[in-house]
């Protein structure tokens, strides 16, 4: 009975709170024009409020049919073309004062070699933490949280089973004591029926 009472509010909370989540995520993904930010129109905390963007004509309609319901078609937002191209092309002569080395000797002099290459064998594994998002192929039972939960759940289950068996044995003994004990005197004794004749 208790799990059913707890299940109903949990389902209500999960199903009732679910529609609120997508609304917030849609609002967070609205696009802000980066050109407006670069031109300095808005400062920190002074960005336009999304709720104030709508016109007040939506609130003027009464819904009783008094006014004309036709709305003017709203134009689609214009696509802003970026001033800087979005490709990765870097011009060859980006800065006239810097010369790119082209000979093999110059390339070898400019090469940076790491002091110690990381190797997988023989390293100290004490500082390497296995993240759950990176351990894709690992077994679920290798994680300590899962093992601890399984052990605690098993202990609680075994204790519950032992107490249930003890309760059944106790009730059986109590029932057996009353039904087979013939040496006891009855609690109620029938009064003798003596008849007197006149």
Curated annotation (Swiss-Prot):
One GO CC annotation: focal adhesion
Region (Disordered): 42-76, 94-130
Tissues where this protein is expressed: Ubiquitous. Highest levels in liver, kidney and lung.
Composition bias type Acidic residues, residue spans: 48-71
Extracellular topological segments: 24-145
Record key words, sorted: Glycoprotein, Heparan sulfate, Membrane, Proteoglycan, Secreted, Signal, Transmembrane, Transmembrane helix
Annotated Basic and acidic residues bias: 102-118
Pfam families: Syndecan (PF01034)
SMART domains named among the record's database cross-references: 4.1m (SM00294)
PTM characteristics: Shedding is enhanced by a number of factors such as heparanase, thrombin or EGF. Also by stress and wound healing. PMA-mediated shedding is inhibited by TIMP3.
Physiological role: Cell surface proteoglycan which regulates exosome biogenesis in concert with SDCBP and PDCD6IP.
PANTHER family in the record: SYNDECAN, SYNDECAN-4
Family named by the database record: Belongs to the syndecan proteoglycan family.
The protein's name in its UniProt record: Syndecan-4
Species of the source: Mus musculus (Mouse)
Name of the encoding gene: Sdc4
């Amino acid at each position: 009975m208790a799990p059913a009472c707890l299940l109903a509010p949990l389902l209500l909370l999960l199903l009732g709170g679910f529609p609120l989540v997508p609304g917030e995520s849609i609002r967070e993904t609205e696009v802000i024009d980066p050109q407006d930010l670069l031109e300095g129109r808005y400062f920190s905390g002074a960005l336009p409020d999304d709720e104030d963007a709508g016109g007040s004509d939506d609130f003027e309609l009464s819904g009783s049919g008094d006014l004309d319901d036709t709305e003017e078609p709203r134009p689609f937002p214009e696509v802003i073309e970026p001033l800087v191209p979005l490709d990765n092309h870097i011009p060859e002569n980006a800065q006239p004062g810097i010369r790119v080395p082209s000979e093999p000797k110059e390339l070898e002099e400019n090469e940076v070699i790491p002091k110690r290459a990381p190797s997988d064998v023989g390293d100290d594994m004490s500082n390497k933490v296995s993240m759950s998002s990176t351990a894709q192929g690992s077994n679920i039972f290798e994680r300590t949280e899962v093992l601890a939960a399984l052990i605690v759940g098993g202990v609680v289950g075994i204790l519950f089973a032992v107490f249930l068996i003890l309760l059944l044995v106790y009730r059986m003994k109590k029932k057996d004591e009353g039904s087979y004990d013939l040496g006891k005197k009855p609690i109620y004794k029938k009064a003798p029926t003596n008849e007197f004749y006149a």
